[in-house]
Swiss-Prot record:
Record's protein name: ATP synthase subunit alpha 2
Highest taxon, organism lineage: Bacteria
Compartments where located: Cell membrane
Species the sequence originates in: Listeria monocytogenes serotype 4b (strain F2365)
Any matching Pfam family: ATP-synt_ab
Enzymatic class: translocase
Gene: atpA2
Any GO CC annotation of this UniProt entry: proton-transporting ATP synthase complex
Keywords noted in UniProt: ATP synthesis, ATP-binding, Cell membrane, CF(1), Hydrogen ion transport, Ion transport, Membrane, Nucleotide-binding, Translocase, Transport
Length: 504
């Protein structure tokens, strides 16, 4: 049998051409400690920070601490079946979540797995949960408004697309309601919403999902939930999963609103993991990198420049305060990262002012440039008027003999507070907000009894819908006030039909 060199060389060439390289990582370690959502493993000398690791029972973990002799791992799932001495294997991958249109209308966990019982999610796209935030030259300044439908926010602390606006307040002051109402108001705004519930009760998340479904908002919303019963690693990862899903839409030129409800619970989960992993505690026992925990998350919210499609992520992070103390560690951290804050005060909430927004401590650092011209015109002096009223109100308690000008200011202030009240799940379109604020500023409400102000607003909106829809349409399309004479005439005409009720 003769061997021909040409045949051998052609066979070798063929095999080289058909060769497919596959990265196979076969490092195997041994679990030396397991408990409370974390594990330690020996023998994974080449593991990378943030790498996914697989335990022998199929549960995944993520390498967090790379030490001399072992690796600290956070476990992404039930850890009760893992035993000391079990094998743990490197995968060579980093943590990714599914992304894309198929997620809209679904409720998923921190790993992107469906938890709503509606079957698997048909999507092939994935994104890593950790990503570099857009750089300076990839962004543009905030210039488009995000209409929340809440008068007190759109007038006093306007939010723009691509902004990060902190919502801060004690528990039970209506923080979640503000976010849900904002999501409901995005129905016709070409906006995708992602609601990330961190450490909430299952029943609370269920109520939020049902509210969104009832109002048709699930058609453009993804809910990411890491409930209070879940292990701490899933609470820690939930916000990153939410923003990874949002980035897919942003880089495709779409606008996304992400609500993180709330980051205090994420910080507490991260503190728990860090202490279990024996990292040195700092102030309030939080680890030294708790600022970076939130800054790297919130910096991923941006308004991209036009060459990248002009998409945006607007972030509404929540932080819970204790007894209104906004100078605690986590609140001050997040205030310094965000572009403004909306402070909800329990005193106002319990006195019936809802949403309970404290106009003095709330601020929007970049939203003003995104506010529409009509709203800027009517709401220009509103914040100062409100601050002056609060000051006068405290003085007026001490003396009854007030001069006419002071009395007039107090009366106007009462009506301003009343106008800014709003019912739950009833967001208001911006043109109707402009209308009632115009009526307030131009003294149409001065002789309307305070208890009738909200009825006046409701009847005025209905009357304008039927008799002067063209004025509302003009505000909506031009974003400017219509001809003043026409608007004044219409308001006077309505005012003549309004019948004040008897004093209560």
């Amino acid at each position: 049998m003769s061997i021909k060199a040409e045949e051998i060389s052609s066979i070798i060439k063929q095999q080289i051409e058909n060769y497919q390289s596959e990265l196979k990582v076969s490092d195997v370690g041994t679990v030396t400690y397991i408990g409370d959502g974390i594990a330690r493993a020996h023998g994974l000398d080449n593991a990378m920070a943030g790498e996914l690791l697989e335990f022998s029972n199929g549960v995944m973990g993520m390498a967090q601490n790379l030490e001399t002799n072992d690796v600290g791992i956070i476990i992404l799932g039930p850890y009760t079946e893992i035993r000391e001495g079990d094998e743990v294997r490197r995968t060579g991958k980093i943590m990714e979540v599914p992304v894309g249109e198929a997620l809209i209308g679904r409720v998923v966990n921190s790993l992107g797995q469906p938890v709503d019982g509606l079957g698997p999610i048909e999507t092939t796209g994935t994104r890593p949960i950790e990503a570099v935030a857009p750089g300076v030259m990839q962004r543009q300044s905030v210039n488009e408004p995000l209409q929340t439908g809440i008068k007190a926010i759109d007038a006093l602390v306007p939010i723009g697309r691509g902004q990060r606006e902190l919502i801060i307040g004690d528990r039970q002051t209506g923080k979640t309601s503000v976010a849900i109402d904002t999501i409901l108001n995005q129905a016709d705004q070409d906006m995708i919403c992602i609601y990330v519930a961190i450490g909430q009760k299952e029943s609370t998340v269920r109520n939020a999902v049902e509210t969104l479904r009832h109002h048709g908002a699930l058609d453009y919303t993804i809910v990411v939930t890491a409930a209070a019963s879940q292990p701490a690693p899933l609470l820690y990862l939930a916000p990153y999963a939410g923003v990874a899903m949002a980035e897919e839409f942003m880089y495709n030129g779409k606008h996304v609103l992400v609500v993180y409800d709330d980051l205090s619970k994420q910080a507490a989960a991260y503190r728990e993991l860090s202490l279990l992993l024996r990292r040195p505690p700092g102030r309030e026992a939080y680890p030294g990198d708790v600022f970076y925990l939130h800054s790297r998350l919130l910096e991923r919210a941006a308004k991209l420049n036009d060459s990248l499609g002009g998409g945006s992520i607007t972030a509404l992070p929540f932080v819970e305060t204790q007894a209104g103390d906004i100078s605690a560690y986590i609140p001050t951290n997040v205030i310094s990262i965000t572009d403004g804050q909306i402070f909800l005060q329990s005193d106002l909430f319990f006195s019936g002012v809802r949403p309970a927004i404290n106009a003095g401590l709330s601020v929007s650092r970049v939203g003003g440039s995104a506010q529409i011209k009509a709203m800027k015109t009517v709401a220009g002096t509103l914040r100062l008027d409100l601050a002056a009223y609060r000051e006068l109100e405290s003085f007026s308690q001490f003396g009854s003999d007030l001069d006419a000008a002071t009395r007039a200011k107090l009366e106007r202030g009462k009506r301003t507070v009343e106008v800014l009240k709003q019912d739950l799940h009833k967001p208001l379109k911006v043109e109707k907000q402009v209308l009632i604020l115009y009526a307030l500023v131009h003294k149409y409400l001065d002789d309307v009894p305070v208890h009738d102000v909200l009825r006046f607003e409701s009847e005025m909106n209905t009357w304008f819908d039927h008799n002067h829809p063209e004025l509302l349409e003009e505000i909506r399309t031009t974003k400017k006030l219509p001809d003043e004479a026409k608007l004044e005439a219409a308001l006077k005409e309505f005012k003549n039909t309004f019948v004040p009720s008897e004093e209560k």
